[in-house]
Amino acid sequence: TRCKGKGAPCRKTMYDCCSGSCGRRGKCG
């Protein structure tokens, strides 16, 4: 679960990095 792009560092209820690894239906786009 690591992300290095934009937004927060993918935690447990805040996924934002859609260009790293964590990209759930949170805030990607």
Swiss-Prot record:
Use in biotech settings: Could be used as a diagnostic tool for the autoimmune disease Lambert-Eaton myasthenic syndrome.
Assigned keywords, A-Z: Amidation, Calcium channel impairing toxin, Disulfide bond, Ion channel impairing toxin, Knottin, Neurotoxin, Presynaptic neurotoxin, Secreted, Toxin, Voltage-gated calcium channel impairing toxin
List the residues marked with site Important for Cav2.1/CACNA1A calcium channel binding.
Answer: 15
Q: What is this protein called?
A: Omega-conotoxin MVIIC
Q: Which InterPro entries match?
A: Conotoxin_omega-typ_CS (IPR012321)
Keyword Secreted set for record: yes
Where Cysteine amide occurs, the residues are 28
The source organism is Conus magus (Magical cone)
Molecular function in Gene Ontology: calcium channel regulator activity; ion channel inhibitor activity; toxin activity
**What family does the database annotate?**
Belongs to the conotoxin O1 superfamily.
Q: Which GO terms describe its cellular component?
A: extracellular region; host cell presynaptic membrane
Compartments, record wording: Secreted
How does it get modified after it is made? Not hydroxylated; hydroxylation, on a synthetic hydroxylated MVIIC, has a significant impact on the oxidative folding but not on the biological activity.
What's in the domain note? Answer: The presence of a 'disulfide through disulfide knot' structurally defines this protein as a knottin. The cysteine framework is VI/VII (C-C-CC-C-C).
- According to its UniProt record, where is this protein mainly located? secreted
The record's disulfide annotation reads: 3-18, 10-22, 17-28
Positions of the pro-segment in this chain: 1-2
Q: In which tissues is it expressed?
A: Expressed by the venom duct.
What job does the chain carry out? Omega-conotoxins act at presynaptic membranes, they bind and block voltage-gated calcium channels (Cav). This toxin preferentially blocks P/Q-type calcium channels (Cav2.1/CACNA1A) (IC(50)=0.60 nM). Also shows an inhibition on Cav2.2/CACNA1A channels (IC(50)=7.0 nM).
